[in-house]
Every structure is written in structure tokens, then in C-alpha cells.
Amino acid sequence: MKKITIILSLICVLAISSCEGFLDVTPTNQADSSTSITSAADAQVMINGLMNKMTSSSYYGRNFVLYGDTKGGDLTIYTAGFDDNMYYFAHRAEGGSQIGFWITGYDCLLQANNIIQGIEALKEEGTTGLDDMLGQALTIRALIHFDLVRLYGKPYNMDGGASHGIPVVTAPVDASAKPQRDPVKKVYDQIVADLTKAAPLISKSKSNGYVNYYANQAILGKVYMYMDNFSSALTAFKNIIDSKAYTLYTPANWVASWKSQFGSESIFEFAMYPNEGDLGASSLGVRYSRREHAHNSAYGYFLASTYWKNIMGKNDIRWGIMTFDHMRGQEARSDWDDCCYKYLGSPTLAGDGKSTYTAVNIKVIRLSEVYLLAAECALKSDKATAATYLNAISKRDPDRPAWTAATINEDAVYNEYRRELLTEGKLFFEQMRQNRKVTFEDDAWGFGTTSQYRDKTVDRTFFRAILPIGIDEINSNPDIYQNPGY
């Protein structure tokens, strides 16, 4: 796409022309990846810059996480007009959050590719100590492609990956090039190739705020699940679980875990800092806050739906991260707690140990999710093992009977996934992979919040289940394929 190439080329030119020397005018802990890599130290600074860019509001810092939950039916809205375009599926090619996904995603791919190219050039010259950083960059490149293809392409298992995905970009792109959308299968093949190449290079040591071998395996496992390769996915997940490198939170410390950074379950989380990635009044925490609680601009945007609350047990410890909404007040029953405070640390705005309670890290991969995905995979061949994995998480409700090989099923795993991962940006993507219908609690409060863009119940055949390509992209390259319906 010409638009992509123009964006990528301008980023390179501006970054290079604005810097007299590598670290002359940039922070010492991060830099734009289009500057030259001359040492291992340079490569690390470049990776820092890439990780920081991925925490922007148009990616993991807010919108990508919102997308995965507001479209999944376990959240509803109090009233219309407050950041609700994703909930309504009001996507349009002329503008909106999907434009930010596209631009930021390809910006990050540019940086990842420049890091990879620079490191590989140094390795050819004989520089050592670069394997881990190369493995990190390859893993992140795979993750970005994975995110983009899920936003703009149909699920792999919907048609075997035959439909249009996104342009695979694995090298700096010349401004005259016009890369077209590759088939979903080709995108997934590249993702698997990057993750497989990275696995023997990347360190198994924990590195807070960065990907390691276990993050690589978790991403690989999820990718394989999208390809219906459950045996390979289970192998990847078992590599994590059996290593015992991470441990599940006990029921007693699950709630408090949200007040800490890089806990025992955290396989990969983006670090958010008050002076760098903190979005303040525009943060995820404020989006999920009760009205005017976390900030005077908090409108009580998104609340847990009755559908989610109905699958929660009365004594489930996960109620501890929820609190009352602005309509009912604190005297309401505990099972009316609608507001999720994971991104504020606690209902008392504890944060996660920084000077501002809105600069809370984004937990991308937790061990709890790995257990639940492993349970789904094991269910295909070993129900007893699947029950063991599921029980490790479901015991967070002390009243829930243990699952057995005779009682476990796909819905049991799916509903536990919903309980555990509310507001973590996962649900809608999983629903599309599993070919599930999504029902929305529209008009929950009687204030006319029914969507004009979708029905009350949708599935993955609905054209708005994937995003449109932006009109600027279409105008710059008329040959690019627009998703049907837009």
C-alpha cells in the first residue's frame, strides 16, 4: 500500500534528519529504531523505544485492550456518547480508532524490522551478545502481525486462511512499493516462522517489561489455537506450565496482585510510567472507573453486564477488584458491583506502586490465561488433564465444585475465561476464534443505548466483526482490497 510506504518512509526520514547523533537529542533509555544500530547497547535502546511506542493510546495503552472487551458482551454502557464506537461496532473507513490501529501497528513493524536488520548486520560483522535481543524483536514482530491480522482479517479457522489478511512486512519498505494484503494463511505462516526462529535465541530469564522465551511460547500457543492446531498449542503452553518459572496467584492474594507490578503470574506486561506512558484522564483505568471517581472526567463508560455477573459465584474472590457504579451506590448488593478496577490497582485507587494510580502496567500474558488455554487444548485429548488445569483457576470461587473428566466441557472453560480475564482485552478475539455468538445487554439502563450498527446478537459472519481499511489507504492505492460491507 502506498499509504503504508509513505508513512514508513516519512518516519525514517524525520527520525534520521532530526538527530545529529545517535543519542544527542533522545533519551538514553529509548530511541526511534530508524537510527543506526552500532552496538548491543544501541539495540537495547531501540527495543526500549519500540516497547514504549506499543503502549500508546492507539495500541496496548488503551484502544486495543478496549476493543477486545467492549465488543465481547460482558460489558455494557450506561448511556450513549462516551467512547462507545467499539461497543456499537460503529466502524467506518473515514476515521475512528481503527485508523490508529493500522498506523501505529505498521509504525511498530517498521521499528521492529529496523532492529532485526541492524542486529543481523552486526552479527554478520562478528558482534556477539545479540541473540536475546534478536529473539525479542522477532517475537514482537510476530505479535504485531498477529494483532493486526485479527483486527482486519477473518479468523484463520473460518476459511483456512484463504481470505484477505494484512500486508506482511518483514523488511524496510521502499516508498515506491505498493504491498497488497496477503492471505490470512501467509500472515500466520510468517508469525509462526518468526516465533519459531526466535525461540532458541531468546532468554528464559525474567526481564520485567520485555518478552522472554515463555512469552514467546504463550504467543505461539495462541497462534496455533487460531489455526486449530491444538496439540502444538498445548505443547507450547506446557513448556510454560511445566517450567514452574511462574506461579499462579492463590485465592488469598489474587486481589492484591493488581496493586503490584510484574507479579508471579506475569509472563509479559508493558510497563507504564508516570512520565512516559501514563495516559492520566484518558487511561484504561479511568475508562473503567465509576463516574468521577478516578478522575472528574470519568463518565462511568463501561460496566460489567448482567451476563457476566450471572456467571459469577457470590463468594468468588474476583469480586474484590470490582466496585459499585454511580447509579446504585455503595449500599447496593455486592453482586451489583459493575466497575472493574484492574487498571487502577484497587477500588481504593491504589495503583501498582507508582506516583500516579493511572500509570498501571498492562498485563498482556498471565499464567492464568495460559492454564485456561491449555485446558481448552487438553480437552480435545485428555479431559482429566484439562480438568486439572481448569480447577487451578476455578477454585478462586470457593463454592464452585471441582471439574472432573466427566463434567468438564468447552463452555466450562470458556466461562472461566470470562470470569478471570474481564477487561484484559481478550474476550472478543476468543469469541471469534471459537465461532461463538455475542449478545449485548443493550438498553440495560433504559436510556436508549441500542446500536444502529449491529443487532443485539452478532457472530463472526457479520461484516463489522472485522475492521475496514482506512479511506486514505484506499485512495492512495485503489488496488487494495477493502473488507466487504464498508
Segments predicted by a language model, with ranges:
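Membrane-proximal, proline-rich intrinsically disordered regions
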Residues: 19-66, 288-293, 298-301, 311-314, ...
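TPR-repeat structural position
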Residues: 188, 230, 383-384
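Bacterial Sec-dependent N-terminal signal peptides
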Residues: 3, 9, 15-41, 191, ...
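Short, surface-exposed recognition loops and adjoining beta-strand edges that mediate ligand/DNA contacts
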Residues: 33-34, 61-78, 153-162, 204, ...
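Conserved, well-structured interaction surfaces
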Residues: 82-152, 182-183, 200-204, 355-362, ...
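Extended ligand-binding clefts on enzyme/binding-domain cores
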Residues: 228, 234-238, 242-355, 360, ...
